[in-house]
Regions:
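ATP-binding glycine-rich phosphate-binding loop
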Residues: 4-21
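A glycine-centered beta->alpha junction motif in the catalytic cores
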Residues: 66, 72-87, 120, 137-149, ...
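A short beta-turn/loop motif at secondary-structure boundaries
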Residues: 10-14, 62-65, 250-254
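ATP-binding pocket architecture of kinase catalytic cores
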Residues: 20-133, 171
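Active-site activation/catalytic loop segments of kinase-like enzymes and analogous catalytic loops
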Residues: 136-146, 207-241, 255-273
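Active-site acidic catalytic loop and adjacent metal/ATP-binding pocket
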Residues: 17-23, 105-106, 163-211, 218-225
Length: 274
């Protein structure tokens, strides 16, 4: 890697990764000293699966796992978040393009691929235990700041019981490729093409999850009318879906995801000073 001082640092996300742009090669260095298996090895493996299935994702240019970094393809600095946020009219047209990419992603059958260490990585299942632990972040980090101590124990017990009951009512099986963070800030726009980034957390899970991530995105304010149009377009392009069952899963997973996000944001503030 070049002298890091000569590289342009790019604004990161909520993770412990750092990103530096190499203008000479139009690439990005992803540096990860913590969770490097997920942030480097698994990230590359998932990108390979996406690319294999003709979905635009960062190609690996070089790697130095020993020194905690990989170099990947750069898709510019324009996200679909910025495009949609600044668009006064016809936001739905952009969302239709995104839904088509989601549909393509949900057709992925590959669950195993070799990473850059030439070892097979298998995409794991998005089990209810993971969904439960994610929702529990709300209880662990947000609730203690909002309730007096005497009420926390009772609330936690009731909360956990309710979440477990709700999870048991999910209709759709875990049989679909799930990005797990599929929203407009993780979709890059370059040369009239959309690229998918930040896919290291992908699992095989419920078909409704990524649509819930996209439509009920806490970072992007959209009207209920637009949300409904995007949902209906997805249903229209997925004829085999049982609407009532799917909508119930969509609503439940959206609630669970947003409980997780509230917990994560509070943890970032309290534990990580971000």
């Amino acid at each position: 890697m070049k002298n890091i001082a000569k590289l342009k640092k790019i604004k990161g996300d909520a993770s412990f990764r750092e990103f530096y742009r190499n203008k000479d090669k139009n690439s990005i260095y992803v540096i990860s000293k913590k969770e490097k298996i997920k942030n480097l090895l698994i990230y590359d493996a998932i990108n390979k699966i996406l690319i294999k299935n003709k979905i635009l994702a960062p190609k690996l240019i070089s790697e130095n796992y020993l020194n905690n970094y990989i170099e990947i393809q750069y898709f510019g600095d324009q996200t679909l978040y910025e495009i949609i946020k600044n668009k006064k009219n016809n936001k739905f047209k952009t969302f239709k393009k995104i839904v088509k990419i989601l549909n393509k992603m949900q057709l992925i059958q590959d669950k195993k691929i070799k990473n850059f260490k030439n070892k097979f990585y298998k995409v794991h299942e998005y089990k209810n235990k993971i969904l439960f632990d994610e929702a529990k972040l709300f209880c662990d980090w947000y609730v203690p700041k909002m309730l007096p101590k005497v009420k926390i124990i009772k609330f936690r017990k009731k909360f956990k019981s309710e979440i477990k009951n709700l999870l048991s009512t999910l209709n759709y099986k875990n049989d679909t490729f799930v990005h797990r963070d599929f929203h407009v800030s993780n979709l890059m726009y370059q040369n009239k093409k959309i690229a998918v980034i930040d896919s290291q957390d992908a699992l095989i899970g419920n078909k409704a999850y990524d649509l819930a991530s996209l439509i009920d995105d806490v970072r992007l304010k959209t009207s209920n009318k637009l949300k409904e149009k995007v949902f209906k377009f997805y249903i229209k392009t997925n004829k085999k879906i049982e609407l009532n069952k799917f909508k119930r899963d969509f609503e439940l997973l959206s609630i669970l995801r947003n409980l997780k996000i509230i917990g994560i944001f509070m943890r970032l503030a309290l534990r990580d000073n971000k």
